[in-house]
UniProtKB/Swiss-Prot annotation:
One GO process term, biological-process aspect: rRNA processing
Calcium is among the record's keywords: no
Organism: Homo sapiens
Coiled coil start-end: none
Tissue: Expressed in the fallopian tube, cervix and uterus. Also expressed in the brain.
Consequence recorded when altering residue 216 to S: Found in a patient with a neurodevelopmental disorder; uncertain significance
Protein name, entry field: ATP-dependent RNA helicase DDX54
Residues involved in ATP binding: 140-147
Catalyzed reactions: ATP + H2O = ADP + phosphate + H(+)
CDD domains with a match to the protein in the record: DEADc_DDX54, SF2_C_DEAD
Keywords: ATP-binding, Helicase, Hydrolase, Nucleotide-binding, Nucleus, Phosphoprotein, RNA-binding, Transcription, Transcription regulation
Similarity comment: family membership: Belongs to the DEAD box helicase family. DDX54/DBP10 subfamily.
Length: 881
């Protein structure tokens, strides 16, 4: 019988059984732990020894194994802890998310708080390169998340707020709205980093901006003009800046900011990192040499597919004077009432006119243009963003970078003259995976710009077919069609009655017409190829756009087809045959001539019909027109051509003249294409010529005059008269009523900065000195390296140091007073309001009124309770008193 391992036999109590189980479990745990320690020590020593032996064999004899530096190490070289932490943050597996980028916890927490899970393609390409410290020039289509591409590496580089005086990051934006949007996004993404941000914009009070810079911000978000103004006023040095961003870089370099950008770049240190972002950037980095790039990395995504797949485009051929009527019809009938729409116009006069006109037609709208007051711009944009109005009429000011949520439609009232401007306009919709629609009103003189746009996009332009059944809205994308005249007449009649009833609207319409004429004269010319193709297009026979034809009944469509057929009717009789009898000599000659030329006429009509069929189909993006398909072999065509010449003319003198029919050029191009050897043939321009011409900043690849102007060599004269000819230019003086010389006048209106450049003297008006005197702030160098941000303003003439001469300098490391902020807190505002209310109460005799009211209340209570009721009521009324 086996021995019993448990307690003694007999009746067991519950306490004894529990004690026995506890001891047994404790013995098992101790045995397992000792066994694991023995096996781990033996196996671990064996594995470490095996790894060391293998590494020693790879390194060879006599070479020590690399180890981590210890505390006894006397080397001055310390490991880069930032790189080690970043490598530790990276995941071993390829997750494809933000986790694999090695971002710090505050930055990653801000990304997760914002709701981003997976980086976009441009973020996946650019963020690792920027984190490596390289200069980057990046391009991706609108709505692809370019703002986070330069904000996340900036947060990762700056880490947290620094006590050193001076901003460490600078973000330049071309417009106020884009800078405000960048500030909002910076605060949301960098919520947990503790970095301070200052906003320097034109139109705001400079005193507030002085105070913001005295708060020692880490990041400055600014527009170039106001930043230069503040820098000159404060003698601001930017030597601590180590990260510079040019947002919408191509717009910055072409808006006339060259003088301001040169002054800003001259104030930057030599070793800063530069990042350029935009949706349209050329591949020639020579155009951005002024930005101070050092071995930059070019990253361009979506060069071939510049437009989003979720974006639908429609083009309507309308006259210039009927654009307002078509716009009103689109807003009333095509666009859904709950959708938000942005209308792009050419000038501010168009914006003011359309705002007043649409308001009279019960369309809630607002307008924004560059000359508008900054406060009004902010209010109008907020009204549109919050849904107070459904339509926003803007100039190209809002075409760059603005991310308006829930935007569904864009209407190009004035068709853009550049392809990349069209990209930025329609890029306001179809962002972040949403769908959108872009409607464009194209006047007949804007057809060459439309063809240039499709050359730039690499797409084909589809023309609406006349006298065809409506195909619905499925094939509307990228189609050019007419607007029914009945729609135009219906809307235009209402607009004309509105204009007749309003004198103000008539004045705005007249100003808008004059502005349109100035805009047409000043806009850049289209390419010669597009002008030639536009002249060859048959726009008279253009069909209705399917977006409109699908809304009509069958009877209305038949009426429109009848009107189109009447409009396209061309008489075959000549002037000699009209109202002429059969015996008339002129009529007989023309009939004989037509009978003799019947073959040539038939061939010409066949070619014309082929061209018309080709125009009804998609117009390809090639600069030259595609060849028509030939039905007959070339040899038969040549024989037929020879026979027709001999039949028409009785005598042929000299060589057989080449005919100038429609198929001749196509045949020649096909023959030349067959003779080319693709291996040795070098074209005179690259394949992406049209695309790069549209993206170019300096007009490279544009008109011949622009290229020739850049190649002009100005030689110095060899005589005194020729040397001073350029300086002695005369200018009309309106006050003196005569021509005056300009020599030396420019330098009087300019001042020389610390960088040696001359800028306008209006930048220096001693506003900063006046602000310091008002705030009683002592002079200090805001950009001195190593200074602490705790050095605040020092009060002059204080009670403590009165009569002791100059203030004692603070010892290094001791905190000094901070700058008194001009922005009041909520508690200060509430305290000030209560104090004002109390003062107003006392001034109007409030104490006397209060005491009189209390006396009346006591009398009412005494009359109502004492002496006229039960004793219980008297006691209750006493308690209430």
């Amino acid at each position: 019988m086996a021995a019993d391992k448990g307690p003694a036999a007999g009746p067991r109590s519950r306490a004894a059984m529990a004690q026995w189980r506890k001891k047994k479990g404790l013995r098992k745990r101790r045995g397992a732990a000792s066994q694991a320690r023995g096996s781990d020590s033996e196996d671990g020593e064996f594995e470490i020894q095996a790894e060391d032996d293998a590494r020693a064999r790879k390194l060879g004899p006599g070479r020590p194994l690399p180890t981590f530096p210890t505390s006894e190490c006397t080397s001055d070289v310390e490991p880069d802890t930032r790189e080690m932490v970043r490598a530790q943050n990276k995941k071993k597996k390829k997750s494809g998310g933000f986790q694999s980028m090695g971002l710090s916890y505050p930055v990653f927490k801000g990304i997760m708080k914002k709701g981003y899970k997976v980086p976009t393609p441009i973020q996946r390409k650019t963020i690792p390169v920027i984190l490596d410290g390289k200069d980057v020039v990046a391009m991706a289509r609108t709505g692809s998340g370019k703002t986070a591409c330069f904000l996340l590496p900036m947060f990762e580089r700056l880490k947290t707020h620094s006590a050193q005086t001076g901003a460490r990051a600078l973000i330049l934006s071309p417009t106020r709205e884009l800078a405000l949007q960048t500030l909002k996004f910076t605060k949301e993404l960098g919520k947990f980093t503790g970095l301070k941000t200052a906003l320097i914009l034109g139109g705001d009070r400079m005193e507030d901006q002085f105070a913001a810079l005295h708060e020692n911000p880490d990041i400055i978000i600014a527009t170039p003009g106001r930043l230069v103004h503040v820098a000159v006023e404060m003698s601001l040095k930017l030597q601590s800046v180590e990260y510079v961003v040019f947002d919408e870089a191509d717009r910055l370099f072409e808006m006339g900011f060259a003088e301001q950008l040169q002054e800003i770049i001259a104030r930057l240190p030599g070793g800063h990192q530069t990042v350029l972002f935009s949706a349209t950037l050329p591949k020639l980095l020579v155009e951005f040499a002024r930005a101070g790039l050092t071995e930059p990395v070019l990253i361009r995504l979506d060069v071939d597919t510049k437009l989003n797949e979720q974006l639908k485009t429609s083009f309507f051929l309308v006259r210039e004077d009927t654009k307002a009527a078509v716009l009103l019809h689109l807003l009333h009938n095509v666009v859904r009432p709950q959708d938000q729409t942005v209308v792009f116009v050419a000038t501010k006069h168009h914006a003011e006119y359309l705002t007043e006109l649409l308001t009279t037609q019960r369309v809630s709208c607002a307008h924004i243009y560059s000359a508008l007051d900054p406060t009004a711009r902010k209010i109008n944009l907020a009204k549109f963003t919050l849904g107070k109005c459904s339509t926003l009429i803007v100039t190209d000011l809002a075409a760059r970078g603005l991310d308006i949520p829930l935007l569904d439609n864009v209407i190009n009232y004035s068709f853009p003259a550049k392809g990349k401007l069209f990209l930025h306009r329609v890029g306001r919709v179809a962002r972040a995976g949403r769908s959108g629609t872009a409607y464009s009103l194209v006047a007949p003189d804007e057809i060459p710009y439309l063809l240039d746009l499709h050359l730039f996009l690499g797409r084909s332009l589809t023309l609406a077919r006349p006298l065809k059944e409506p195909s619905g809205v499925a094939g509307v994308d990228g189609m050019l069609g007419r607007v029914p005249q009945s729609v135009v007449d219906e809307e235009d009649s209402g607009l004309q009655s509105t204009l007749e009833a309003s004198l103000e609207l008539r004045g705005l319409a007249r100003v808008a017409d004059n502005a349109q004429q100035q805009y047409v004269r000043s806009r850049p010319a289209p390419s010669p190829e597009s002008i030639k193709r536009a002249k060859e297009m048959d726009l008279v026979g253009l069909g209705l756009h399917p977006l409109f034809s699908s809304r009509f009944e069958e009877e209305e469509l038949q009426r429109l087809r009848l009107v189109d057929s009447i409009k396209n009717y061309r008489s075959r009789a000549t002037i000699f045959e009209i109202n002429a009898s059969s015996r008339d000599l002129c009529s007989q000659v023309m009939r004989a001539k037509r009978q003799k030329d019947r073959k040539a006429i038939a061939r010409f009509q066949q070619g014309q019909q082929g061209r018309q069929e080709q125009q009804e189909g998609p117009v390809g993006p090639a600069p030259s027109r595609p060849a028509l398909q030939e039905k007959q072999p070339e040899k038969e065509e040549e024989e037929e051509a020879g026979e027709s010449v001999e039949d028409i003319f009785s005598e042929v003198v000299g060589r057989k003249r080449q005919r100038s029919g429609p198929n001749r050029g196509a045949k020649r191009r096909r023959e030349e294409a067959r003779q080319r050897d693709q291996e040795f043939y070098i074209p005179y321009r690259p394949k992406d010529f049209d695309s790069e011409r549209g993206l170019s900043i300096s007009g490279e690849g544009g008109a011949f005059e622009q290229q020739a102007a850049g190649a002009v060599l100005d030689l110095m004269g060899d005589e005194a008269q020729n040397l001073t000819r350029g300086r002695q230019q005369l200018k009309w003086d309106r006050k003196k009523k005569r021509f005056v010389g300009q020599s030396g006048q420019e330098d009087k209106k300019k001042i020389k900065t610390e960088s040696g450049r001359y800028i306008s003297s209006s930048y220096k008006r001693d506003l900063y000195q006046k602000w310091k005197q008002k705030q009683k702030i002592d002079d200090r160098d805001s950009d001195e390296e190593g200074a602490s941000d705790r050095r605040g303003p020092e009060r002059r003439g204080g009670k403590r140091d009165r009569g002791q001469g100059a203030s004692r300098p603070h010892a290094p490391g001791t905190p000094a007073g901070r700058v008194r902020p001009e922005l009041k807190t909520k508690q200060q505002i509430l305290k000030q309001r209560r104090r004002a209310q109390k003062l107003h109460f006392l001034q109007r005799g409030g104490l006397k009124q209060l005491s009189a009211r209390n006396r009346r209340r006591v009398q009412e209570l005494q009359q109502g309770a004492f002496g006229r009721g039960a004793r219980s009521k008297k006691g209750k009324m006493r308690k209430r008193m």
